[in-house]
Amino acid sequence: DRPLSVSARLGRLQFHQSGKFRVLQLTDIQDGPKVSKDTVKLIEASLDATRPDIVIFTGNQIAGYDPAYAQTTRKRRWSASVGTTRETASSKSSEASERFEAALERTRASVRATVEQLVRPLADRGIPWAVTFGNHDFQCGLGNAEIESICREFPGCLNPDPAGLQAEQYLPSQRVFACEPGTFALPVSDVDHTTSVLGLVLLDSGDYARSGGYGSPSAEALRFLAGVPEMMATQSQKRVESHETAKSQEQAVPCMVFQHFPVQQYYQLLKPAATNAARAIEGYRNFAGKHYVLDEEKTLPGSYLGEGISCPDADSGEFAILEQCGYFAISAGHDHRNAFVGTVPISRNSADVRMAKVLSKVIGGLMMIASPTSGFGSYGPVPQKRAARLIEFDIRHPYEPRTQLLEYGELVGKPSAGKAYAYGMTSESKPESEGVDLLHRPTWWSKLLSWLRK
């Protein structure tokens, strides 16, 4: 059958003849081996409504604390699995080791079952996908490298195999820049495939810090983040030089990063508020003791804040890299009840001269996106507001993407799951108009107005 993804038909991530390129983000599905039917319905409806070029999963696909992983689960990466602790306390025999290995094999089968249910709708429609990790995936007892290896067993997965850098199956002509599990980059070419217009960077933003709170990207991942825009430009230039009508490639390819944790600077999209102010939310850890509301001058209509932004305690320097190395947007998950889009100014004071021209294209600053859970297996907003996020790029202004939440209530209807549970929303629901409808679906009111104009 003909792939739903235009890029899959072309064999690479590429802008269409229409000048558009679409990414669908799914985050914090966070379920066990039996994925909620409502989650699958949301995925299917979102794919059919948006026809994305690629789907990006931004972490916590696996609820590593699920009872299915009771024999192998671990709370922290540096701690032993529960099964290992129990066996050590009772026996050091080879029999105990065999029992634990059998438990690990059951965990692998359970993780494989979760992944299969999540990506089957994508495979059925011929849509490529990529995945990074959060703070719960590894808790099942498998490392991110092994989970990534399981993901690569399924068609359409673009996560690179350490043995090679070429994406296979759906996108045989796609270049992939690899770093480590969950951290890699995918260039997106122009309509003629003569140059790279932008890059999609997936970043493993870490899990937990030994000092407390959430972790940060590894030093290697941060170095990769800083260098990949120039790496993409160098690779693209080699292709450009062999193309007769080639356009000059910039020193760096502007990029957008997708990751699990928001960075501390997301708080720049908020403003302090009185404890009893309407829709005020207390900050998280380092920001605790103060209350905040969204800054309407910095965020788009329809944004809502349902919980404190749960960022790492330490500033890893990631934001400075995004500012200075050619990034125009960051999209994160993790906070299941937050859904907002805003822009913060970019400081160019210490930018490399080579980056000046690239940064000048990012005229609006750095776009920062927070998305609610796409799943029904854990906490979140009311079930009708669990959502996928569409991000649409236009070749005329590729570094100013438009984005839209695709909520279950609008796409599917009334959820059937009794498993999903919601914390009380302390912010207003999405207003009637969230801005432009990227799906271009006429409402009954717009149909009536159109009829009256005839």
Label for each model-derived stretch:
Residues 28, 43, 55, 60, ...:
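Divalent metal-coordination and catalytic microenvironments
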Residues 9, 80-249, 368:
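Extended active-site neighborhood of metal-dependent phosphoesterases/phosphodiesterases
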Residues 32-34, 63-66, 131-142, 208-211, ...:
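Active-site environment of divalent metal-dependent phosphoester hydrolases
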Residues 20-30, 197-207, 258, 367-373:
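Active-site-proximal beta-strand elements of phosphoester/diester hydrolases
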Residues 1-109:
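N-terminal active-site segment of His-dependent metallophosphoesterases
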Residues 51-53, 199-202, 213-339:
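His/acidic metal-ligating clusters that form di-metal
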Residues 188-189, 304, 310, 338-446, ...:
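Binuclear metal-dependent phosphoesterase catalytic core
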Residues 19-22, 50-55, 123-130, 196-198, ...:
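Loop/turn elements at helix/coil->beta-strand transitions in domains of secreted/extracellular proteins
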